[in-house]
Amino acid sequence: MVNLVEIRDLKVEATTDSGRRVEIINGVSFDIAEGEIVALIGESGSGKTTIALTLMGHARPGCRISGGSVSVAGKDMVTLSEKQRARVRGTEVTYVPQSAAAAFNPAATIMDQVIEVTRIHGLMSADEARLRAVELFTALSLPEPETIGSRYPHQVSGGQLQRLSAAMALIGDPKLVIFDEPTTALDVTTQIEVLRAFKSVMKKGGISGVYVSHDLAVVAQIADRIVVLKGGETKEIGTTKEILDGAKHPYTRELLSLIHI
């Protein structure tokens, strides 16, 4: 398989209030193949979101990428200029946030917001973008896909808004989508429905994914492989089946003891 993402010896530093630098990501390395969905899992503070953001060339406020490389489709996101990164974001690499509500402007229609990235980057005509959006609404099992785009964010459910957030990320046919705990606020039944819809569209399109979560039961629904993180370090990497059926690291087994799949 061809790798879309290659992270090598990634290090990220944070600056404390006293001005001291602390390494919060310490030498993390892993790959993501084309069309593969990889989950980053660990407790709060394990570094999973920090690592995911480096795939867009981002560092959190007060942090900096201090070492290693982050390659996406042959581009090192660490060394690209900000102008070059801006071209990659929204086209080759996209992001689905934890809060779909925060991603939408309450005063604009859903359709206008979903297709906005295609206008910004000149990816297709407005008519083509609207047709593509309806295709995605259908593929993501949204009700009334032909007309849901004319609604406003407050007129759809939380689960529907999360799927629409995914449609926004997928509209430009990206190579990689980063999902940052997007189903946390949903009930279990809705979570499963949304995850299945995400996975179906990703697999049909051959799109790679990074799924950030603290919940192994959730990632079992969508991930091909799992990277277990603690304290900014990799503790275990394996296929979802390998991790669920034969976890080797004590921390992974601890996470498994908290779930029922």
Where are the model-predicted features located?
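Hydrophobic anchor residue at the start of the ABC signature
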Residues: 114, 166, 177, 190, ...
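ABC ATPase "signature
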Residues: 234-238, 246
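Helical segment within the ABC ATPase nucleotide-binding domain
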Residues: 192-205
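A short, surface-exposed alpha-helical micro-motif characterized by mixed small hydrophobic
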Residues: 219-221
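Conserved ABC transporter NBD signature motif
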Residues: 64-76
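Conserved small/polar residues in nucleotide/adenosyl-binding loops
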Residues: 259-261
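A short, proline-enriched helix->beta-strand linker immediately N-terminal to the Walker B motif
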Residues: 171-175
